[in-house]
Amino acid sequence: MVQLLHSIKAHNDKVWSVSVHPTLPIIATASTDKSTKLYKLSARQKFPLVAKLEDTHKRSIRSVAFKPPLGGADTPKSDFLDLPALAAGSFDSTISVWGIDEPDVEYDIEEVIANQKEILTSPNNEWNLMAIIEGHENEVKAVDWNFQGQYLASCSRDKTVWIWETDPETLEEFECVAVLNDHSQDVKNVSWHPSMNILASSSYDDTIRIYQQDIAGDEWSCVGILNGHEGTVWCSKFESLKSPIADSSVLRLVSASDDLSVRIWVAKREQEDDEQAKLELPSSIRHTNEMVWEVESVLPSVHKYPVYSVAWSALTGKIASAGSDGKIVVYSETEKGKWVIDSIHEGAHGVHEINCVIWAQLDDENEILVSAGDDGYVNLWKI
């Protein structure tokens, strides 16, 4: 059952995407009105506005992504105050990176770290522009950080995927370490694996591409092509290995398409012994790991118009999808590769299209589903 918990009128124009911080109860929006807004995920505090970031981009902000904490979301550094940072990709072909200064509070650093969920999500923090990243020739369609916050991926209508490297502690410089030209059309989305340096891109050319560094850690290249959709692939997300339904011997990916389908793809994971054996080969014959991906499942057909967004919960293993028909659909896996519909919510944003769904946790750690639509609303749902 999908029940509306709260509705936020975030913008007077379309909300393209939403990002949730991996460890803090805070979300960010991306809108056609060229601004980003941050809200605290606290029902007790009535989901207050934390910050508004504007006057930087000349055109729509299409995508936002919070940087994970140092050490990753699963194992953040416990003795380090990791200040939140946000990347925003725009149709003006640039990416902005935002962050906050260390809070000016009367506590010592240990107390600040212990209470960071409150202190770092306070409206009293000032969000500052830290960097503008330039490189793409056309609109930036999506941005996403890897699980350690060292790499930022971006994609564009210029058919390319770029990978930028930075020092996750300072975010002072962003160096382009790869420009990947494997797609033949507009690239709609990029998404990193939650705990591995593997990247997926989704495109207007109807394919998904998988990228990984070579064994020596020098070059990034395409190691897998997922063919099967018969229309634009709008979005793809990896399954978290923390999920209660995850199999540690394989990788899985869910994708959403213009062809009205939601698909699950699977590939075997290479074991550490195999990787070590390849490292011991001479570099002249050492090859990148090619990954063979197959369709494991096509989820039950529900959507009548293009599916724009999918989200895979690390907490429950449930998948949510949404798109042009205004429906939110939630699916559960009953046995390996067999999925059933949990619930369908029609008209989740009235007559408007839904551009994004993500899973998030409130400050009380209860999981919710967040949706964003053409109506300018961000809706929070109990599942």
Swiss-Prot record:
It comes from the Eukaryota. One of its GO terms (biological process) is iron-sulfur cluster assembly. WD repeats lie at residues 10-49, 56-108, 135-175, 182-221, 228-275, 302-341, 349-383. It holds the Pfam family WD40. GO terms for cellular component: cytosolic [4Fe-4S] assembly targeting complex; nucleus. It is found in: Cytoplasm; Nucleus. Keywords: Cytoplasm, Nucleus, Repeat, WD repeat. InterPro entries: CIAO1/Cia1, G-protein_beta_WD-40_rep, WD40/YVTN_repeat-like_dom_sf, WD40_repeat_dom_sf, WD40_rpt. Interacts with NAR1. Belongs to the WD repeat CIA1 family. Essential component of the cytosolic iron-sulfur (Fe/S) protein assembly machinery. Required for the maturation of extramitochondrial Fe/S proteins. This is Probable cytosolic iron-sulfur protein assembly protein 1.
